[in-house]
């Protein structure tokens, strides 16, 4: 299978249909990381679409094409944090009207195993800096170097934050299957790919 760099070079030469390969490769990673920040599956999917469109429009300026996955993850995190800030501002404007359904995302309603729900709740309750490092390193299996680059942290900070996240989650995570957390289903993958491919 061709590398990201080879695919990007062909896309830049006009083979736009190859962008679908990159999206399908990174969809699950982006969804999990987006969910760890925004905790709303519809909004996470919308952020993914925005991320893919922005990345496509800037492909020609990407110098390190072999680092596409890391670059894409940075775009997603920035967009997710921006949306999260907007949500906080909206909540402050509607002070006094507590959003009791905040944790009732469509994704959580669909999950039928108590273990998955327990894991998602535990991960979502982590402080943001620990949650991001945990999702990237343990669920997405991103390297320490990639995590350092995306989050602009030193190697020791990545390791310390991961260790603290594990300590906080130890009881809930013992013997679980992390890949089942924030599961990204095939129909959602197809929806995002089709949306972006129709826009480019």
Which sequence ranges carry the predicted segments?
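C-terminal edge and immediately downstream basic/flexible tail or linker adjoining helix-turn-helix-like DNA-binding
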Residues: 167-200
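Structural recognition of an alpha-helix C-terminal capping motif at a helix-to-coil junction
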Residues: 32, 46-53, 66-78
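Arg/Lys-rich amphipathic alpha helix in sigma70-family domain 2
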Residues: 60-63, 74-94, 112
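DNA-recognition helix of helix-turn-helix
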Residues: 77, 81, 151-175
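A short, charge-rich alpha-helical start-of-domain segment used by transcription regulators
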Residues: 2, 8-30
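Sigma70-family region 2
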Residues: 12-13, 49-67, 86-88, 99
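Helix-turn-helix DNA-binding module
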Residues: 42, 124, 128-132, 137-157
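Internal acidic/polar
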Residues: 1-4, 89-112
């Amino acid at each position: 299978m061709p590398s990201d760099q080879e695919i990007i070079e062909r896309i830049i030469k006009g083979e736009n249909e190859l962008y679908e390969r990159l999206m399908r490769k990174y969809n699950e990673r982006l969804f999990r990381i987006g969910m760890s920040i925004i905790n709303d599956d519809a909004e996470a999917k919308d952020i993914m679409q925005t991320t893919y469109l922005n990345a496509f429009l800037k492909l020609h300026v990407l110098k390190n094409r072999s680092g596409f996955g890391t670059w894409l993850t940075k775009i997603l995190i920035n967009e997710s944090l921006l949306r999260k800030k907007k949500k906080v501002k909206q909540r402050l404007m509607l002070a006094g009207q507590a959003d009791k359904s905040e944790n009732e995302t469509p994704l959580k309603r669909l999950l039928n195993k108590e273990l998955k729900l327990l894991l998602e709740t535990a991960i979502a309750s982590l402080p943001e800096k620990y949650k991001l490092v945990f999702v990237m390193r343990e669920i997405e299996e991103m390297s320490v170097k990639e995590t350092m680059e995306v989050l602009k942290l030193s190697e020791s900070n990545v390791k310390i934050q991961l260790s603290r996240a594990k300590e906080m989650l130890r009881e809930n995570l013992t013997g679980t299957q992390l890949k089942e957390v924030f599961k990204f289903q095939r129909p959602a993958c197809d929806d995002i790919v089709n949306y972006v491919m129709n826009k480019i």
